[in-house]
């Protein structure tokens, strides 16, 4: 079925048009024309605009504001609109009604993917048109407009697909607004390390900023790495527009498969184990590939010029990436973790009643594999200096495995023991293990409390400044593994009780 014949898309289009699009388009036109008027005024009376040295510089500034508004409307506004539409229609039962029609899952998903955000799409087209006029009047290369629009619309499709999966996972539309707010607040912090943080390529801020630079500046060496240079993937320069597109495409295929599967059968997991590992692997390798050239396997000794080190503090980069790995892994684990009842039914159908069979299907085994893979990728930064920095690596790798195992065990334990109250008790446990030590450290002004946190040992060890208490951190990691063992025992007990009840019934 073509898109203009898709019943879901047609319905969403009618709803958008019924709500009115003219006012929204006029607002976008006023924004674009205001910026265009600024450029026209500069060309007429350059003396009134002392901040610009040339018409090209003025054009870049006004066009940058135009695409900033376009990103805000199309990517962030579209994400929120699709999420709220899908959550509300699931709550009203319309999603399930559409599933019972002869429509294929791909047709249903594409209708919700491209239909609800049409108002935002019209606004973005208006801004893109005025942006093209600005580029032409400022005598800028048209490739600037083509490249930035390509990046913006590809990012919009990628984030809209994430909105589909989020809408299939949560029925409260407020969660989408909260997710957008968190992303808007967190994203600017990645600008501190422009070419080294993956979020600058998922939302292609680096690629867009790079297109604004003079092409002749791209021939600079790696030591001058900033917004003007190509990112380096394992020390190989890669055009940022291609890097962003390849990253969005590879992840988008996995997200599309998840949306299709969840639409065909709502009892299927959002992400299969193989897809979870593939997604985690793509994100992890891409992120560590971007920063590998800083140390080139000789961590903590930087392998780049002293000029770069003097102007850029890299000591906190790997700890930040370490924490980001935790956040990314926990999200993927939560999405890929099957419900205990689903695992139990699958095991009973196969007539397997041992804990080994349950372990192979649970999130715990997935967490173990992900932790091992994260440790292997982290080893790339230590491969040539492992003899003198093995303690740092051991602490960071052990911390990665411990965090993922503790989360997976707690997640399933709370589901088994607390049922519908599982999320609240999981949040309580994570707060006590991860954040309470930092609060106690602030209250009592003792940094040792902070190191007890489940998140702290790896971050502290990976800080490039000299550390005298590595043995102490190794002891904390060992204590975390003892906690993991206790949770493992409790996890086994809960599963035995569930299997006993199933056998009795």
Give residue ranges: language-model regions.
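Hydrophobic alpha-helical transmembrane segments of membrane proteins
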Residues: 1-92, 112-505
């Amino acid at each position: 079925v073509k898109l203009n014949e898709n019943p879901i898309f047609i319905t969403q289009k009618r709803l958008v048009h019924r709500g009115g699009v003219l006012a929204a388009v006029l607002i976008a036109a006023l924004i674009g024309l205001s910026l265009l008027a600024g450029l026209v005024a500069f060309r007429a009376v350059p003396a009134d605009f002392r901040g610009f040295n040339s018409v090209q510089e003025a054009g870049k500034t006004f066009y940058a504001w135009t695409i900033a508004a376009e990103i805000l409307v199309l990517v962030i506004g579209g994400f929120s609109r699709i999420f709220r539409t899908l959550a509300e229609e699931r709550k009203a039962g319309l999603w399930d009604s559409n599933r019972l029609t002869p429509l294929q899952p791909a047709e249903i998903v594409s209708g919700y993917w491209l239909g609800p955000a049409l108002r935002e799409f019209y606004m973005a087209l208006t801004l893109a048109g005025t942006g093209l006029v600005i580029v032409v009047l400022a005598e800028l290369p048209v490739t600037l407009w083509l490249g930035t629009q390509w990046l913006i619309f590809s990012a919009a499709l990628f984030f809209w697909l994430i909105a589909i999966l989020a809408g299939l996972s949560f029925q409260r539309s407020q969660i989408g607004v909260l997710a957008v707010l968190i992303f808007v607040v967190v994203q600017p912090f990645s600008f501190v390390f422009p070419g080294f943080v993956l979020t600058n390529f998922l939302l292609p801020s680096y690629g867009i900023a790079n297109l604004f630079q003079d092409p002749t500046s791209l021939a600079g060496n790696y030591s001058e790495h900033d917004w003007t240079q190509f990112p380096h993937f394992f020390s190989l320069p890669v055009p940022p527009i291609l890097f962003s597109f390849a990253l969005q495409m590879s992840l988008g295929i996995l997200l599309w498969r998840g949306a299709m599967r969840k639409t065909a059968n709502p009892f299927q997991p959002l992400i299969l184990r193989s897809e979870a590992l593939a997604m985690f692997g793509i994100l992890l390798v891409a992120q560590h590939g971007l920063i590998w050239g800083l140390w080139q396997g000789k961590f903590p000794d930087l392998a780049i010029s002293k000029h770069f080190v003097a102007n850029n503090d890299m000591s906190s980069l790997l700890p930040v990436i370490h924490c980001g790995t935790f956040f990314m892994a926990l999200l993927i684990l939560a999405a890929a973790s099957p419900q205990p009842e689903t695992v139990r039914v699958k095991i009973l159908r196969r007539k397997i009643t041992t804990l080994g069979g349950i372990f192979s299907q649970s999130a715990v085994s997935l967490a173990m594999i992900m932790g091992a893979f994260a440790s292997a990728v982290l080893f790339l930064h230590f491969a040539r200096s492992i003899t003198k920095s093995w303690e740092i690596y051991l602490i960071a790798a052990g911390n990665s495995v411990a965090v993922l195992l503790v989360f997976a065990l707690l997640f399933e334990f709370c589901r088994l023991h607390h049922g519908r109250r599982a999320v609240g008790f999981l949040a309580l446990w994570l707060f006590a293990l991860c954040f309470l030590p930092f609060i106690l450290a602030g209250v009592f002004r003792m940094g040792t409390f902070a190191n007890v946190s489940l998140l702290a040992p790896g971050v502290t060890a990976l800080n490039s400044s000299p550390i005298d208490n590595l043995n102490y951190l190794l002891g904390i990691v060992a204590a975390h593994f003892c906690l993991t063992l206790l949770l493992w025992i409790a996890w086994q007990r809960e599963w035995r009780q569930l299997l006993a009840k199933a056998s009795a019934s």
